[in-house]
A protein has these predicted regions:
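PAS-family sensory/regulatory domains
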Residues: 2-3, 132
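EAL-family c-di-GMP phosphodiesterase catalytic domain
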Residues: 43-50, 69-84, 96-200
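Regular, well-ordered alpha-helical segments
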Residues: 26-30, 95, 175
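Catalytic core of bacterial c-di-GMP phosphodiesterases, primarily the EAL and HD-GYP domains
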Residues: 3-86, 163
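Conserved functional hotspot residues or short segments at active or partner-binding sites
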Residues: 89
């Protein structure tokens, strides 16, 4: 991925992945599984090389999927550095029925400014908060996570905590009010056919 980013070809890889995701969603929905969704990443480079809105909405229309089942992950940094046009495009996605997720929330220096300036649907709390090993840092990190979770409730947003690896973390996060988790505690990344065999 780093090579694709350095050469400016990441947008081609992203578009390829978007189409694969939409194709899979179309298959699932044809089989009656409207409850499943896939999150895809949008990088800053994508905005430079193509009309992201037209590309994604065209795929959704071509394969006739429910827009809300294709969730769009945009990093906090990408939103912070985005142009007015790019931020407007993100809002167009929301108006068209897509859900926008801020990925790696809390990794930047202006996290709360991001929330002030941008309407989104989901915050994904950066896994760095759970990777702290020093006891005094763990307590501080969990306090920050608790604050973010409380904030999402006030703003009416959903929240996902990334990097969950232990039952203890699950228990603490559940007490704080987080109900959606992502991490190796559940599974490492697996091929889609293996996912279907295990969970469908």
């Amino acid at each position: 991925i780093e090579v694709f980013e350095k050469t400016g070809l990441i947008y081609r890889l992203d578009r390829f992945v978007w189409e694969l995701a939409v194709q899979k969603l179309a298959q699932w929905q044809k089989d009656g599984r409207d409850d499943l969704y896939i999150s895809v990443n949008i990088s800053t480079k994508d905005f430079y090389y193509m009309n992201v809105y037209e590309t994604i909405t065209s795929l959704v229309e071509t394969y006739k999927i429910i827009p809300s089942t294709l969730k769009l992950e945009i990093t906090e940094t990408a939103i912070m550095t985005g142009t007015a046009g790019e931020l407007e495009m993100i809002e167009r996605f929301r108006k068209s029925g897509f859900q926008v997720e801020i990925d790696d929330f809390g990794s930047g220096y202006s996290s709360f400014n991001t929330l002030k300036d941008m309407d989104v649907d989901v915050l994904k709390i950066d896994m760095g908060f759970l990777r702290t090993t020093r006891p005094e840092r763990i307590e501080r990190s969990m306090s920050i996570i608790n604050t973010i979770i409380s904030l999402t409730k006030t703003l009416g947003l959903s929240v996902i905590t990334e990097g969950v690896e232990t039952k203890e973390q699950i228990d603490k996060l559940t007490q704080m009010g987080c109900g959606i988790y992502q991490g190796y505690y559940f599974s490492k990344p697996i091929p889609v056919d293996q996912f279907e065999d295990a969970y469908m």
